[in-house]
Structure formats: C-alpha cells, structure tokens
Amino acid sequence: MYHPQCELLMPLESLEMDVGQSHLAAAVAAAMPGELNFHLLHSLDAAAAAASSTAASASSQPTVDYFFGGADQQPPPPAAMQYDQLAAPHHHQTVAMLRDYYGGHYPPAAAAAAATEAYFRGGPRTAGSSSLVFGPADDESAFMVGPFESSPTPRSGGGRKRSRATAGFHGGGPANGVEKKEKQRRLRLTEKYNALMLLIPNRTKEDRATVISDAIEYIQELGRTVEELTLLVEKKRRRREMQGDVVDAATSSVVAGMDQAAESSEGEVMAAAAMGAVAPPPRQAPIRSTYIQRRSKETFVDVRIVEDDVNIKLTKRRRDGCLAAASRALDDLRLDLVHLSGGKIGDCHIYMFNTKIHSGSPVFASAVASRLIEVVDEY
C-alpha cells in the first residue's frame, strides 16, 4: 500500500540486500533522510536479521520494492519467508542506530523507548503476511514521526449543535417545559394590556409603560369624579331638606297662631314670636372642590372646580386659532366666561379660562376636560 514517506526512498530502489550482506542495511539506514519514519528502519533491520539466519534462493531475495509495494512486485510464497517480532537485542540496536542518526535531535530516551516498545510488541500487519501496513495518504499519522495512530472519524450527522432556541432548558422540545409556560404567560399579559388600552380614553402612546401611566391617571381621575358627584348629590339633598323644613315650620306656626288669636290678642304676638323662632338655623354644606388633568398627543387640559368657580388651563402644541373652538365648548357646557388670558411659550399656545357654573347646572370636571380635548383635537 502506498505511503507518502515512500517517496523519500525512491533514490534507494536500486539497492538490493542479498543473503549474507547485512552490512548493506546500515548503509541504507545512513543514507535515509531524517524525515523518514523509524518504522521503515525497523523493517530493514528485520530483513537483515532474517537474512543472516535463513538461506533463500535468489528469486526470493527481499528488496526495497518488496517492502514498499512496487508496481511489478509479486507477493512472495507464504512459506518462503516469515518475519516475526525482533528479539530484545535487535530492539536496542535499532533504537541506538536511530539516536545516532538524528544526532541528538531524537526525542528523550523514555519517550522513544515507550513508542518503540509499543510498536515492536505488535504493530499493524496484514493478514497472512509480515509486511508493514501504512495508513491512507490522508491520515495525519502518515506525516508524523512515531507510532501510527488513526485519527477519529468525523461524525456522520454533519456536526450540528443544538441551540437553546430548538431545545428546552432541560433537554425537552420547544413545545414543552419552561418555554411553553413562558410563552403562555406572555400571551396572557399581552391580552391584558390590549384590554386595558381599550378602557383608557385619549391615549397618548401605544407602548406598555405609557399605557400603565395613563391607566393610573385615569383611575385617580375616576376617584375624584366619584367624590365630586357625591358632593353634588349631598348638596342637592340638603337644599331640598332645608326647603322642606321651612315649609313645615311655617305651616305649624300659622295653625298655632290661629288657635291663639281666638283666645286673646296677646296670643297673636306670641304666635308671631314663635313663628320667627321655629325656623332652624342653616346647616353648613361641604365645600365642592375637585381637579382633573387630561392629555392627548398635542393637547393638555387642567380643570379645577371650587364650588361654582371653574378654572381651566388649556395647552395646545403646533397650532394656534383653537380659542374659538374652546369658547364654543364652554358655551355648550353652560359655563359663563369671567376672565381669559393667553400666551405662547416655544411652540405651545397656553390659555387660562376663569368661568362660573350656572345655578342648577350638573357640570363636573371630567366632563369639562373631555369636551375641551375633543373639540380642540378636531380643530
């Protein structure tokens, strides 16, 4: 079988080692290059040792072509010549010859002895013959000085690695385990964000952080609206109670005065005094106070209500002329304009409205803010 190192011995093909010419083995070894594997030297030494102990015919004499597989070389008869493992003296002789040839560049004695003994105890041989077996031309061990070692065969699967995207954290598939639960959790969270986004009026942005911020402001606004409506209902109820108490007191005082007038004239004076004393003192109603802030992409509204006074701050970006639309919205809400001021800061137009609520008008802060944003954004 062909070996790349055999090319180094092509100039030595003409040399023949006849029976009884063991001195030629040393000459051939001295002429070999340093890159040659020492297994070939061992083969030549084995041929010389076998030639000194066995007589053979001229037709069966081993040559260099015999060891390296010449093109016209026929395999020898099985019984003509057999090569066995060298004895211990030949081992040491071959190692010493290699060490002298390399001139001190040979590996340390311990490593060389271990490598040599590993080969001499039974190197790779073909079945039924004693010729050396060289690896294929593409084997890495063919270009190394030392015992033959076959490189591991590559994996047939293509060597693809599993990534964490195709395999679970614990070896499971992507549809099982932690990744499946995480995917379901994210889907539920996205559905909740979408539902919350639909409940918020006048959203500024669509990202999750802004949605949460708008939701917090809207919840606080709803709480203030509930308090404001509660105060309005309580105030209206107290007004009705006060009107009912005055009517009842006046009726009872008139009946008592008529009874006493029949008896004496002094009873009329006492009835008049009793009529003035029957009217209960007015109760102090709770003060109505609330505020709301609403914003859209280009509009900001701040509404503050204290009793019947409504103070409105309107901020509009990148566009002027929205004052007429805001005035029409205040008229629709039945708010009387008391004072108006305005200005411009950068690209923002700011207006301040001081208004009053009509008596009996059910106006609250959230309705004012929503109406102003709706009208100004459409302008």
Curated annotation (Swiss-Prot):
PROSITE patterns: BHLH (PS50888). GO terms for cellular component: nucleus. Disruption phenotype: Has normal vegetative growth, inflorescence and flower morphology, however has smaller anthers and does not produce mature pollen grains during reproductive stage. After stage 6, during which anther forms four somatic layers, the three inner anther wall layers remain undifferentiated. Meiosis progresses normally from leptotene stage to metaphase I, but is arrasted at anaphase I and no cytokinesis occurs at prophase II, resulting in degenerated meiocytes. GO terms for molecular function: DNA binding; protein dimerization activity. It is found in: Nucleus. Residues 173-186 are annotated as: Basic motif. Transcription factor that binds to the E-box-containing promoter regions of the transcription factors TDR and EAT1, activating their expression. May have a role in specifying the cell pattern of the inner anther walls and functioning in meiosis progression. Required for male reproduction. Acts downstream of UDT1 and GAMYB, but upstream of TDR1 and EAT1 in pollen development. Belongs to the bHLH protein family. This is Transcription factor TIP2. It comes from Oryza sativa subsp. japonica (Rice).
